[in-house]
C-alpha cells in the first residue's frame, strides 16, 4: 500500500479537525431548510449541493457509485436501481471493504455513505476522506436513518455533498446523486 492510500482498518492517531465556523454556518442554514422539509413531509430529508460543473465519469464512459451500506437488502436494492440507471455499482459494508474499494486504482465517481456501520462511524470516514488529497473532492452523499437537524448539520459540516435520510424516496436519492454529479 502506498502512502497515498487510506487505511480505514486502523484508528486515527490524532482527532479529526473540527469544521470551520464558515462550514458550521453553511451547514446550519442547509440543515434548517432540510429540517423544514422533514417537518412538512414527516419522514425524510433530501439535501444535495449542486456542483458548479458536470463531473465526468472517471472511466470516461459510465459513472461508478460506491454504496457503503451494511443492510444487504438495501445495498442490493440500490445496486439494482442505480445499475438499471446506467451506473457501475460497487458495495462495501464495513471498514475493510471500504478500505479495499477506495484504494482500487479507479476511484468511484460518488459515494453513498451510511453513518451507522457495524464497525465504523460514517462521519469519521467522511472526515478522513476530506482530509486526504486523493479523496478530498470525491462527492459523498450521506444516506442514513439519522434525520434530526443536528445530524444533518453534522454531516454537511463534515463535508458531505448531500444528505438523504432513511427511509427515502428513490426519486429523491436519484435526484441528489444527479445534482451532485451535475447531471440534474
Model-predicted regions and their roles:
Residues 91-110:
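Acidic, metal-coordinating helix/loop segments flanking the phosphotransfer/catalytic sites
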Residues 1-66, 171-184:
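Non-catalytic signal-transmission and effector/linker regions of two-component phosphorelay proteins
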Residues 118, 148:
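The feature encodes the CheY-like receiver
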Amino acid at each position: 500500500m502506498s502512502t497515498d492510500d487510506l487505511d480505514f482498518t486502523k484508528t486515527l492517531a490524532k482527532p479529526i479537525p473540527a469544521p470551520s465556523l464558515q462550514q458550521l454556518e453553511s451547514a446550519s442554514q442547509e440543515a434548517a431548510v432540510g429540517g423544514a422539509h422533514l417537518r412538512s413531509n414527516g419522514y425524510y430529508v433530501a439535501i444535495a449541493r449542486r456542483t458548479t460543473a458536470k463531473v465526468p465519469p472517471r472511466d470516461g464512459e459510465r459513472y461508478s457509485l460506491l454504496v457503503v451500506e451494511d443492510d444487504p437488502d438495501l445495498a442490493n436494492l440500490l445496486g439494482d436501481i442505480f445499475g438499471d440507471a446506467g451506473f457501475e455499482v460497487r458495495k462495501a459494508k464495513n471498514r475493510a471493504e471500504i478500505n479495499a474499494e477506495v484504494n482500487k486504482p479507479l476511484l468511484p465517481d460518488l459515494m453513498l455513505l451510511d453513518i451507522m456501520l457495524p464497525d465504523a462511524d460514517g462521519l469519521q470516514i467522511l472526515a478522513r476522506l476530506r482530509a486526504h488529497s486523493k479523496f478530498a473532492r470525491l462527492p459523498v452523499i450521506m444516506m442514513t436513518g439519522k434525520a434530526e437537524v443536528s445530524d444533518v448539520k453534522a454531516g454537511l459540516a463534515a463535508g458531505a455533498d448531500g444528505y438523504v435520510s432513511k427511509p427515502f424516496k428513490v426519486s429523491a436519492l436519484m435526484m441528489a446523486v444527479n445534482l451532485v454529479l451535475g447531471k440534474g
